[in-house]
Every structure is written in structure tokens, then in C-alpha cells.
Amino acid sequence: MSVRADQRSESSLLSEYYRKYGASGYVLTIDFSKYFDNIEHESLFQMLSEQIKDKTLLALTKYYVQEFGPVGLGLGSQVSQILAVFFPNKIDHFIKEKLRMRFYGRYMDDSYILCNSKEELQNALKEISKLCEKYKIRLNPKKTRITPIKHGVDFLHCRYKFGRTGKIIKSGGRESVKRERRKLKKFRKKLDEGELDRKQIAELYSSWRGFMQYFDSKTLLKKTDKLYNKLFIEE
């Protein structure tokens, strides 16, 4: 699930931006630090109580979350992923409705805003930082930054750039494969230590494979599938 002004793809959003402003302007890239580990339960429960009116469902959800301890959500579970997408929902509305930023996208802990004014993005970052502090969401200072849009937009391990005619050029599949191969080896260790089970790992890997379908990456996927099978299937 990705959050945008009207749920379009990044490529179409950048194309619209280019038609309006060309390749000038800036991108504010926002990254939450150790997002799953730091989700604050009290804030999450307050948001859930505003949305879930069924008391039984709300109680079950709270019980599930509390199983992870006083703070954070576990990796692998689909419920955790849904809650992780939901948690910054108020920030999404603030950016789109209060700051009136049209060119905005988010998935989990990665988000970006495109704007032709650097000053507007600087002011937006100040306001977003205050809201994150309120909900105890930590911004990653190294990855949260404002850069010229002509250098590209980094989102979900991809880089989107404008071609000479405004065509959107998408790259980054090879780097994503390298990261995923490292993750699979860590997942194997977590499996051995009982922190993850095979079903959770399969769901995480399936989600990543779905994302990789956007790339011309059949050969890379075959190699990664081979590693996955070696670590989790062929035993």
C-alpha cells in the first residue's frame, strides 16, 4: 500500500510534475529511523481507537501489538505491515491537506515531497519534524534531506530521473537484489534463533519479489530465488 495524492504510480506523479515545472525544483526525502522497532504503542492505540469502533476488534488488535513488548512491531506479520502503513496516517493528511503538497508519496517509512520551492520544503520539514516528535517517530537525519530534483528521486530502493525529453528513467534493481540477498542470510539466522518462522519469511520474500516485477530483472531474480531455495527449501 502506497500513499499518494490520488494513488498513482511514482512515474505518473513525476511526469505530471515535469509537465508543470520541468526538471527544476527540489525533492524532500523523508526516512523514519528503525521504524518497526520504534513504533510507540500508546500513540498507535490512540489512532486505532479513533478508527476502530468495534470494541472486540480493537481489543484483539491491542493484544496482538502488546505481544511485541512495550514498543515496536514484529517483522513478517501482515498485521504488523498494515499497522506500519497506517501509523503515519495523520502525517499523510497533514502534508496533503494542511501543507497542501500535491506531489507526495509514502510507503511504510519511506516518503518524498516534490516542490518547485526549496523554502517551502524547508518549512514543510520543520512542521513534519514537530508532528513526528509528537507521535514519537524518529527521523533519520542522514536520509532525510532536500536535494535538487534533477539529481533524481530515491524511493523504495529505486531512483527516478528525468530524461532529456521528460521521460521517467527508473533504475536501482541490482542494488535492491544485493540488499535482499543480505536480508535472506539474516532471515536464516533469525529462523534458526526462533525470531521468524518460514511463513513470515516467505511473505516477506514474496512481497519483495512483487516489487521487483517493475524491473527488467529476470536473471537477477533467478539468482536470488536460487539463494532463497538453498536457505529455506533445500534442507
Protein language model annotation of sequence segments:
Residues E67-F68, Q122-N123, L139-E235:
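Right-hand nucleic-acid polymerase module
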